[in-house]
């Protein structure tokens, strides 16, 4: 699902809201979540999951084109951990499809 598909679905389910309003709300939520993560904050949405940062230690990598070794610096990467309700819902719907 893309951001524009999400906006369309929400606008259809909430006909009292204009597409512009829904688009602004979705953009604002994503912007605020990105800002919070970039400040090192954890985001928890009960029933859905949590977003946090995971540390990746420096390591030696390899350029796939040239084969030369490259030193990769340490970094933080965003990480999503699904909540129990989301995991259960996904597993139940996938099992029903088999």
From Swiss-Prot:
Family according to the record: Belongs to the bacterial histone-like protein family.
Gene Ontology CC terms, in alphabetical order: chromosome; cytosol
Encoding gene per record: ihfB
GO MF annotation list: DNA binding; structural constituent of chromatin
Subunit comment: Heterodimer of an alpha and a beta chain.
The species this protein was found in: Hahella chejuensis (strain KCTC 2396)
Protein name, entry field: Integration host factor subunit beta
HAMAP family the UniProt entry points to: IHF_beta
GO terms of biological process kind: DNA recombination; regulation of DNA-templated transcription; regulation of translation
Keyword field: DNA recombination, DNA-binding, Transcription, Transcription regulation, Translation regulation
General function of this protein: This protein is one of the two subunits of integration host factor, a specific DNA-binding protein that functions in genetic recombination as well as in transcriptional and translational control.
């Amino acid at each position: 699902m893309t951001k524009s598909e999400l906006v369309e679905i929400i606008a259809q389910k909430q006909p009292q809201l204009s597409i512009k309003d829904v688009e602004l709300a979705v953009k604002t939520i994503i912007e605020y979540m990105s800002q919070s993560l970039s400040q090192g904050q954890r985001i928890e949405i009960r029933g859905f999951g949590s977003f946090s940062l995971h540390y990746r230690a420096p390591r030696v990598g390899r350029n796939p084109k040239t084969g030369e070794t490259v030193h990769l610096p340490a970094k933080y990467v965003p990480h999503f951990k699904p909540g129990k309700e989301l995991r259960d819902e996904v597993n139940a719907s996938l099992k029903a499809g088999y």
